[in-house]
From Swiss-Prot:
The keyword Ribosomal protein applies. InterPro entries: Rbsml_bL25/Gln-tRNA_synth_N, Ribosomal_bL25/Gln-tRNA_synth, Ribosomal_bL25_b-dom, Ribosomal_bL25_C, Ribosomal_bL25_long, Ribosomal_L25_dom, Ribosomal_uL5_bac-type. It comes from the Bacteria. GO terms for cellular component: cytosolic large ribosomal subunit. It comes from Pelobacter propionicus (strain DSM 2379 / NBRC 103807 / OttBd1). Belongs to the bacterial ribosomal protein bL25 family. CTC subfamily. This is Large ribosomal subunit protein bL25. One of its GO terms (biological process) is translation.
Length: 199
């Protein structure tokens, strides 16, 4: 988990017109919410928001908020980020103020390590789930969860319940769900034959 710092400004005015003006000034409109507080409208410099999400942790980076009155020195993560459908630029951000002693739920990417022995034997790697839902303290949010697939043979899978997790991290997905598998040639040929028959 990476820790970042980001300046924020409180804003009293909201609405589409105000949001457009902020974006034209290279600012991103947003809101900060959390347990025991009313949502607070804020604005953030576009480049600062980019920097706060830089690195492998992305939206799960733990951010120290600077400024914003009572929000100053609060810890937060990016809960939701809206982007322009065409340009991909940031339109609005939701920041979740967290309590460092209370667990929260986040989505963490899965990273595969090594080359499966089944692939070397001609099988096809099927990476079915690229993310896992986990619960942990904010300070324990992993940048990613690594799975070593080196010994994964043809017609075998690694399921959620078999993954080694970092200390203090609990996975919420069904433990029987296959995350990565190696499909064999026989299965591929059967699927191809079935598709040909349907056609």
């Amino acid at each position: 988990m990476q820790q970042k710092q980001m300046n924020i400004e409180l804003r009293s005015k909201t609405g589409k017109g105000i949001s457009r003006k902020l974006r034209s000034a290279d600012m991103v409109p947003g809101v900060v919410y959390g347990k025991g507080m009313d949502p607070m409208a804020v604005s953030i410099n576009y480049r600062e928001l980019q920097a706060a999400m830089a690195g492998e942790g992305g939206q799960n980076n733990l951010i120290t908020l600077v400024g914003g009155g009572s929000l100053d020195q609060s810890m937060a993560i990016v809960a939701d980020l809206q982007r322009d459908a065409v340009k991909g630029t940031y339109k609005h951000v939701d920041l979740h103020r967290v309590n460092m002693s209370e667990k929260l739920r986040v989505t963490v990417p899965v990273v595969l390590k090594g080359t499966a022995i089944g692939v070397k034997e001609g099988g096809l790697l099927d990476f079915a789930h690229h993310e896992l839902h986990v619960e942990c303290l904010p300070g324990n949010i992993p940048d990613h969860i690594e799975i070593d697939v080196t010994s994964l043979a043809v017609a075998h899978s690694i399921h959620v319940g078999e993954i080694a997790l970092p200390e203090g991290v609990k996975v919420l997905d069904n433990p029987k769900t296959p995350v990565v598998s190696v499909l064999g040639r026989v299965k591929e040929e059967a699927e191809a034959a079935a598709e040909a028959a349907e056609a």
